[in-house]
Design a protein with these regions (language model features):
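Extreme N-terminal leader/targeting regions
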Residues: 1, 148, 185-189
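Primarily the HKD phosphodiesterase
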Residues: 40-119
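Surface-exposed beta-strand edges and their flanking turn/coil or helix-capping segments
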Residues: 69, 107-109, 158-162, 176-178
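HKD (HxKxxxxD) catalytic microenvironment of the phospholipase D
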Residues: 121-174
Length: 189
């Protein structure tokens, strides 16, 4: 079943799509406007997979998104099985494609907001061409991959299809492909 995600109730509708994917073969498709609401999407996505290793691959990343990532890296949850507090996002690979004019400002902001986590080895920042937007997160129990076409904020708003996958196999494939960029396109901040 394909649905259209409305800005008014983003998290609620995404949770519904996640439930559909988990019940219906591991995949759910939905439509949304070309701009992702990252300040709502990222907390929902990573909160659905606590203790995850994750990849964020976006063409354009603004200061607000960097701030949201910093907030997520600082969040913790209580792991009942281990009996301890752990970070919601254990390790993050961030892949972006800044324009030449924005690259220096983006690097400074990434360093300012995420420098602590970069120094700890929990965040790896890469710059490379990005063919599609992708979020991937997995924690051994739950695995999510959200894919869509590239950011198109310079265009008129239009609906685009996105795919939410809950299979471990899809997560492994996405992580292998995107992790390789973490090794070859890593930048020092």
């Amino acid at each position: 079943m394909n649905t259209v995600i409305e800005p008014c109730c983003y998290s609620k509708q995404l949770t519904h799509n996640l439930e559909l994917a988990e019940k219906g073969g591991g995949v759910s498709h939905f439509f949304s406007f070309s701009d992702w609401s990252t300040d709502e999407l990222l907390p929902w996505f990573f909160g659905s997979v606590p203790g995850c290793e994750a990849v964020v691959s976006l063409v354009q990343i603004d200061f607000r998104t960097i701030y949201v990532l910093q907030h997520l890296m600082s969040r913790t949850y209580y792991d009942r099985e281990a009996g301890e507090t752990r970070p919601v996002v254990g390790r993050l690979t961030l892949i972006t494609q800044p324009s030449r004019t924005d690259a220096d400002a983006q690097r400074r902001e990434l360093r300012a907001q995420l420098g602590k986590y970069i120094d700890e080895g929990r965040v790896v920042v890469c710059e490379d061409s990005v063919a599609f937007r992708c979020l991937a997160a997995g924690n051994g129990t739950r695995h999510l991959v959200l894919q869509g076409s590239i950011n198109q904020s310079h265009m008129e708003p239009c609906t685009q299809m996105f795919t939410l996958t809950t299979s471990k196999g899809a997560w492994v494939q996405a992580m292998e492909m995107l992790r390789s960029k973490g090794k070859t396109k890593h930048i020092k901040l």
